[in-house]
């Protein structure tokens, strides 16, 4: 059994969850509060069936004990796995006529779009003048540069609210500073 758990480290991913999940007995997994206390960072093992559908298994305390006994830095490994799965940081974008980004959407088929906002070190390179993040659904992360016009901001806010209203796992219709949702000591910052 421990060999299977050790092998699962290659499929370990960080997952941002709403804190209401923690209040239910359905989410009895290791987690870390994020600076914005409505959200937490947890971890899951990703599985894909032969048809490519993704399913998750919550990390258990037993898994953590085995990884730590083997000297595996499991949180660092989850961060690395997320980066490797994010060769394309976003899947969709809207550009201005000058080629600058109005918004970038992380809606990868693995369902970890919201978790990709943890890649702040890499996102900072694309948005050196700053940006906001949004997580209308657990599977969607959105990056919005700080220099939007009022019209662009309204259009973006309307988009966020629409996605939030139809989300399968709703998170928030609001914009946040990246530091609100990334742990201070996160592993690539």
Segments (PLM) and residue ranges:
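Charged, alpha-helical interface segments at or near domain boundaries
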Residues: 1-108, 115
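Short glycine-rich, basic-tinged beta-strand/loop micro-motifs
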Residues: 96-104, 134-145
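Short amphipathic alpha-helix segments
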Residues: 110-124
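C-terminal structured domains
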Residues: 127, 139-189
């Amino acid at each position: 059994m421990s060999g299977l758990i050790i092998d699962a480290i290659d499929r370990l991913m960080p997952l941002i969850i709403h804190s209401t999940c923690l209040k239910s007995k359905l989410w009895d997994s290791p987690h870390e509060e994020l600076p914005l206390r409505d959200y937490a960072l947890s971890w899951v093992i990703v599985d894909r069936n032969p048809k490519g559908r993704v399913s998750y298994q919550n990390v258990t305390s037993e898994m953590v004990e085995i990884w730590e006994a083997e000297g595996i830095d499991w949180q660092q490994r989850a961060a690395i796995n997320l980066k490797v799965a994010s060769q394309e940081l976003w899947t969709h974008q809207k550009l201005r006529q000058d080629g600058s980004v109005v918004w970038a959407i992380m809606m990868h088929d693995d369902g970890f779009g919201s978790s990709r906002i943890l890649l702040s070190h890499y996102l900072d390179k694309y948005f050196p003048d700053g940006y906001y993040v949004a997580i209308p659904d657990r599977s969607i992360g959105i990056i919005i540069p700080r220099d939007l016009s009022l019209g662009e901001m309204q259009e973006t806010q309307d988009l966020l609210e629409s996605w939030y209203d139809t989300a399968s796992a709703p998170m928030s219709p609001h914009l946040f500073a990246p530091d609100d949702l990334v742990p201070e000591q996160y592993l690539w910052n």
